[in-house]
């Protein structure tokens, strides 16, 4: 099975798949698998064409790529946050002419901590603006310390395209279905700064947030504690029992200590306090290579 992949890993591939070409043997591959995880290193127009080819072959596609994230009838899902967007698949299938095949995508890994943290506060307290500075692990670039020695004892203050994705994608996630498309939300206003740091796995975000109806600190903590979603209701194998976890210690969360919480499927939050310019600020952490992609495909 010939795929361009960014990260080199030792993995076992079935013998019957090793002689197949992912671009040329679509029909054959589609007949052999239940669905496709797509994480390829190709041009965006080529990725869009390839993913639609598999979907039209009646093979569901769960994509880690950004190519289809803003296709209006392709759901970009964080399962605890916007599972209702899966309903747009019916419209997508009409466009593609499929009965079973479809495409669903995961969001950019930079926002997988702060979007869930803001989600239970959105409707009741109405988030008006947010600032997030992310400190992103090298695995997000498909790197290890061996392949990326320049990151040692260093911080790189630029990740190409990351800030644009981090500001735009949450608005689709918080959007709504209207007819045959997903319409982006118009609020909150989001600004971001994304840095690459010498950490193997786990993206950390320092978040500042303001509300139309400012909650108390206790109300925020209770909202995080009570928050759960469809993965928890369905008791999916990978679903964390507690999705949002607040640490009272001043030095938490830490990537090294907390990224694997609940098998890497939970979000860790800490240091909630009032801010002089925004209403509140806090720090949150998620495992960038594990969270979300797995249980999008589980139901």
Describe every region a protein language model picked out:
Residues 191-196, 201-299:
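C-terminal active-site/capping subdomain that shapes the small-molecule cofactor and substrate pocket
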Residues 14-48:
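A structured beta-alpha segment of the ubiquitous adenosine-cofactor-binding alpha/beta core
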Residues 46-97:
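Rossmann-fold NAD(P)-binding glycine/threonine-rich loop
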Residues 2-9, 13, 295-299:
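Single conserved hydrophobic/aromatic residue that forms the stacking wall/gate
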Residues 10, 14, 31, 112-232:
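Active-site-lining helix/loop region of Rossmann-like oxidoreductase modules
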Residues 34, 59, 101:
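Conserved acidic residues
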Residues 90-124:
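Short alpha-helices
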Residues 6, 29-31, 55:
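A short, aliphatic-rich alpha-helical micro-motif
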């Amino acid at each position: 099975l010939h795929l361009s992949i960014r990260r080199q890993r030792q993995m076992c591939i079935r013998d019957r798949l090793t002689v197949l070409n992912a671009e040329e043997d679509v029909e054959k591959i589609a007949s052999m698998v239940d669905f496709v995880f797509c994480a390829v290193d190709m041009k965006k127009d080529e990725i869009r064409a390839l993913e639609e080819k598999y979907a039209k072959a009646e093979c569901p596609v769960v994509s880690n790529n950004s190519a289809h994230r803003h296709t209006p009838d392709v759901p970009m899902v964080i399962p605890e946050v916007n599972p209702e967007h899966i309903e747009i698949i019916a419209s997508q299938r009409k466009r593609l002419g499929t009965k079973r095949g479809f495409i669903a995508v995961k969001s950019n890994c930079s926002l997988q901590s702060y979007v869930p943290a803001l989600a239970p506060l959105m409707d009741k307290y109405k988030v008006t603006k947010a600032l997030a500075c992310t400190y992103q692990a090298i695995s997000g670039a498909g790197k290890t310390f061996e392949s990326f020695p320049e990151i040692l004892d260093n911080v790189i203050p630029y990740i190409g395209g990351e800030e644009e994705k981090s500001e735009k994608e949450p608005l689709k996630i918080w959007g709504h279905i209207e007819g045959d498309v997903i319409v982006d939300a118009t609020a909150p206003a989001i600004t971001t700064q994304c840095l690459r740091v010498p950490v193997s796995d786990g993206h950390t975000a320092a978040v500042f947030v303001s509300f139309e109806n400012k909650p108390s600190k206790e109300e925020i903590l209770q909202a995080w504690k009570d928050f759960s979603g469809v993965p928890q209701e369905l008791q999916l194998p990978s679903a964390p029992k507690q999705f949002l976890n607040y640490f009272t210690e001043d030095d938490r969360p830490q990537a090294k200590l907390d990224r694997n919480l609940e098998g890497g499927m939970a979000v860790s939050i800490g240091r909630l306090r009032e801010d002089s310019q925004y209403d509140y600020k806090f720090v949150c952490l998620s495992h960038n290579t594990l969270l979300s992609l797995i249980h999008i495909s589980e139901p």
